Amino acid sequence: MPQPLKQSLDQSKWLREAEKHLRELENLVDSNLEEEKLKPHLSMGEDVQSPGKGEPLHPNVRAPLSHVVRAATIDLPRLGNKLPAKHHLGKLSGLYQMKGCSFNPEWKVPDISDTHFDLQVINECPSRNWKYLTPAKFWPKSISYFPVQAGVKAKYPDNVMQHEAIVGKYLNRLYEAGILYKRISKHLVTFKGKPYHWELQYLVKQHQVPDGTTTCKINGREENRRRRAPAKSISRPHDTERNCHMVGQVSNNRSPIRSCANNGGGKYSSTTRRMACWGGQTIGVNQSCSPRTSAASVDAGRRSKSSRGLSSLSRRETTGNHHHSTNVTNSVEAATRGRSPAGKQVSARDTSSLPESGASRACDKNSSPQKEENGWYLRGNTSWPNRITGRLFLVDKNSRNTTEARLVVDFSQFSKGKNAMRFPRYWSPNLSTLRRILPVGMPRISLDLSQAFYHLPLNPASSSRLAVSDGQHVYYFRKAPMGVGLSPFLLHLFTTALGSEIARRFNVWTFTYMDDFLLCHPNARHLNSISHAVCTFLQELGIRINFDKTTPSPVNDIRFLGYQIDQKFMRIEESRWKELRTVIKKIKIGAWYDWKCIQRFVGHLNFVLPFTKGNIEMLKPMYAAITNKVNFSFSSAYRTLLYKLTMGVCKLTIRPKSSVPLPRVATDATPTHGAISHITGGSAVLAFSKVRDIHIQELLMVCLAKIMIKPRCILSDSTFVCYKRYHTLPWHFAMLAKQLLSPIQLYFVPSKYNPADGPSRHKPPDWTALTYTPLSKAIYIPHRLCGT
């Protein structure tokens, strides 16, 4: 093809060639501007294309991509209706149709350790992020509550009881690790582990009185705050004639027996639960208590002795003020005691003097006073509902580990539906940003946090909004769960604060994303010692490292965020390409595929698309099906185009050299004429076959200049052209324009200074006063990663 030289743009041969290409571009535009062939068909008529069923895929891999693109514009794919269609495309299934999970009765609950980071990290790693994390807060606008019995999803109908049993073990393991609160009553929960400083003011402090009973003191007060009566104590150490029916009356207010009954039936038999009543009596209730019997007996005691109980409540004198103790013990003792009319102590085994309840029937064992190690009782600044907001089920830990279970928490009510929340955004690097921030030629080490989300503590009032259950007990997340959209944002703040301090303290290039840390340094031996120091530094602050996923020593090739990264290039693993080619080969021409399945397919294509010679416009037909929620049918040429994309695999350079070439070609258009001007003084004016919108005429001239001259950059006075967002154009033209203009830079020049503005108006070009600017938005890179 002739290239323009000095004063050569007016040559007749070049003009004839340019006019020929211009007519081809105009025909491509005009064939689709009148009627868009990709509009959804509301019925599956005979016009639906279904040739070549069973035809093997033999694409001509030697053919240029431009030829394959043009063939796809002739043999179009089709959009169908909303009737049921195929949900499987190779190994891909619909996005909302999960692969059937198989229940494993031998599932093991993974080892979960107490992840309590030291609040000294606020001083060691100064950052404004900590005010959002110590503690984190979660305030949904509205909440839908579900019954406790619906806590475990019926994911495995044939193994309901076994599924609930393993979920119960899993939740108990989380509770033992200090990740969950366990509900005792409407105003009282218990947890294990070291309390945070914001929890200390809500801790229930129990003191031993001389007669052996325990009193529950909240912030130094022993009054009944519900009735707002004068400070009266129900328990007197020298009162030997206390009526045993007072147990039933106390249960009317804040009875641990009633809370046990409300938590569901007894499916698991475990250790006796110790709970503190505000009146000073502590009743041990076994978890296998019968809920109906317990509730009925408490009701009977309340009805029979309500008047006598109230009068005795008002006549009691306070025993004196207990001073607020600052030393909180690490264990809570709860004695199971009662008073008979004769003054004898009644144990849970003696059922003659206590009201008939679940505690008197099923608590024959473990009725002696017990000590709960490292346990705390907390009366939060909120009520603890006996309902749940999320549901649970178990799956395999991953495809390689099917012996251990993974707990899936469904808090989707906070991300969709009437309770949907708008969670804050956070910086997430795309591929272009990652290419620009990664250092070249440095050894790298990858660190991975263990139980990353469980490092993030929640405000107790926020925890009450994140309630789950195994069908028997109600638990609340004390640490951030994985099923809430706020958790990734909190984790981003957490790791960013740590990464900034690591980079400053150890003088190493550090990049963090979610629970991954990437460390780079020119000296491999120095980087190895730094990585050990970083691990020690984090572990001293109570932050746990997953050494199974951590790079043991500096390496040159590393897998990070799904990319294979070496010293100079980024690429996609070959196994991923093979899987994608296999899926494309299994596409049946003319078969209807459900839009959810297409959505899954497009997600995989989008990930690999930057590593091909294609562009996003090539996927527009599938996006149209997803947007309209209709079925999709592949044509033979379109399937060949997708396969061709996976054949031209390329690798991307890390830290690509940014060049700003000087513009030598300018274009301009009017509704009737278009002009191309070269810096050497040559120019050409071409007439359009018909009048169209001005932005289409401008784009036609820019595409023509790219075909005929092949410059490194082009000047244009159309912002529509310079932004390269052509999704509003017909698919044929948009795909070709994107393909032509992606490799080159487009500069915006005001019409007043556009050198091609003169030739389009039959005036000479003027390159003397040239003012231009690129309109591409600068990629945002955090300040700490700039200049490294």
Curated annotation (Swiss-Prot):
Substrates-to-products reaction catalysed: DNA(n) + a 2'-deoxyribonucleoside 5'-triphosphate = DNA(n+1) + diphosphate; Endonucleolytic cleavage to 5'-phosphomonoester
Priming of reverse-transcription by covalently linking the first nucleotide of the (-)DNA, annotated site positions: Y96
Record's keyword terms, sorted: DNA replication, DNA-binding, DNA-directed DNA polymerase, Endonuclease, Hydrolase, Magnesium, Metal-binding, Multifunctional enzyme, Nuclease, Nucleotidyltransferase, RNA-directed DNA polymerase, Transferase
Membrane-crossing segments per the record: none
Region annotation RnaseH domain (RH): where it falls in the sequence: 656-788
PROSITE patterns attached to this UniProt entry: RT_POL (PS50878)
Region (Spacer): 201-365
Domain Reverse transcriptase: 376-565
Region Polymerase/reverse transcriptase domain (RT), residue ranges: 366-655
Stretches for region Disordered: 36-56, 220-242, 288-380
InterPro entries per the UniProt record, alphabetical: DNA/RNA_pol_sf (IPR043502), DNApol_viral_C (IPR001462), DNApol_viral_N (IPR000201), Hepadnavirus_pol/RT (IPR052055), Rev_trsase/Diguanyl_cyclase (IPR043128), RT_dom (IPR000477)
Activity regulation (UniProt): Activated by host HSP70 and HSP40 in vitro to be able to bind the epsilon loop of the pgRNA. Because deletion of the RNase H region renders the protein partly chaperone-independent, the chaperones may be needed indirectly to relieve occlusion of the RNA-binding site by this domain.
Keyword Nucleotidyltransferase found: yes
GO molecular function, one term: RNA-directed DNA polymerase activity
Region (Terminal protein domain (TP)): 1-200
Function noted in UniProt: Multifunctional enzyme that converts the viral RNA genome into dsDNA in viral cytoplasmic capsids. This enzyme displays a DNA polymerase activity that can copy either DNA or RNA templates, and a ribonuclease H (RNase H) activity that cleaves the RNA strand of RNA-DNA heteroduplexes in a partially processive 3'- to 5'-endonucleasic mode. Neo-synthesized pregenomic RNA (pgRNA) are encapsidated together with the P protein, and reverse-transcribed inside the nucleocapsid.
Family (UniProt): Belongs to the hepadnaviridae P protein family.
Domain notes: Terminal protein domain (TP) is hepadnavirus-specific. Spacer domain is highly variable and separates the TP and RT domains. Polymerase/reverse-transcriptase domain (RT) and ribonuclease H domain (RH) are similar to retrovirus reverse transcriptase/RNase H.
Protein name (Swiss-Prot/TrEMBL): Protein P
Taxonomic source organism: Duck hepatitis B virus (isolate white Shanghai duck S31) (DHBV)
UniProt lineage: Viruses, Riboviria, Pararnavirae, Artverviricota, Revtraviricetes
